[in-house]
């Protein structure tokens, strides 16, 4: 493996090992680089380095950025030099809130990834069909895997089901479930999901594998498919931030 890995990294889809696998065409998209969003720190690498260097050089500590407008919840650190080995030294804290009514960052990427490559879709979402056993029919949702691809902590089965809660509830509402029954029906659907091998084995295993890539170790929390807001409490000795997720909009109602 010590010989195979460097060759694949250097030659990518043209590596003889990739060619010999018979999967060259299928694997080719995974060697491509895509610019997902330049309107964030990644699009201002020079400015970020300069600002972080200013903070470190002047021994300015306890700096926290409170931002939003990326349609997701994120929490992590901003390092002084992401180009260095290990990604640099943490210099400040970044807390990012989702929006109340905007579509999520995940939804934009989910809609775009199919036109790029269906093979890449597994890095972003996993389609799930949930039979309700009622006149509501079958619910079809696209489960968010982007969080784990970006580095969210590996889930347990309970956490995975809880992540699907808002999406399942929204799908039930769109299917015409009475509002008074939404919470009960959501619990029933989630219980069925947890008992399904496609969820408790296939999806859970895939999410854990993607998380294991450790793509962004400085990112401590990611929820890219959410609407909500943040509540920040600041005292002389402490700052805390609570991310509050709300139910998905149905029509004009949350």
Model-found features: residue ranges?
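Long, structured stretches of catalytic cores involved in phosphate-ester chemistry, encompassing
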Residues: 1-254
């Amino acid at each position: 493996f010590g010989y195979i890995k460097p060759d694949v990294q250097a030659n990518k889809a043209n590596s003889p090992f990739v060619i010999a696998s018979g999967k060259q065409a299928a694997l080719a998209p995974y060697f491509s680089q895509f610019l997902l969003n330049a309107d964030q720190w990644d699009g201002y690498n020079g400015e970020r380095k300069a600002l972080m260097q200013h903070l470190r050089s002047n021994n300015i500590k306890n700096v926290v950025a409170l931002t939003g407008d990326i349609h997701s919840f994120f929490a992590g650190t901003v390092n002084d030099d992401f180009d260095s080995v290990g990604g640099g030294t943490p210099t400040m804290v970044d807390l990012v809130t989702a929006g109340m009514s905007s579509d999520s960052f995940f939804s934009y990427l989910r809609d775009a990834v199919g036109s790029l490559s269906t093979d890449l879709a597994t890095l972003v979402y996993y389609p799930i069909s949930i039979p309700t056993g009622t006149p509501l029919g079958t619910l079809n949702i696209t489960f968010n895997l982007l969080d784990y691809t970006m580095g969210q902590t590996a889930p347990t089965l309970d956490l995975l089901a809880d992540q699907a809660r808002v999406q399942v509830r929204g799908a039930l509402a769109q299917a015409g479930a009475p509002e008074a029954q939404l919470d009960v029906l959501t619990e029933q659907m989630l219980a069925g999901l947890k008992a399904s091998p496609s969820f408790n084995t296939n999806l859970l295993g895939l999410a854990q594998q993607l998380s294991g890539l450790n793509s962004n170790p400085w990112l401590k929390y990611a929820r890219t498919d959410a609407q909500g807001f943040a509540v920040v409490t600041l005292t002389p000795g402490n700052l805390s931030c609570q991310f509050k997720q709300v139910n998905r909009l149905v029509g004009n109602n949350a």
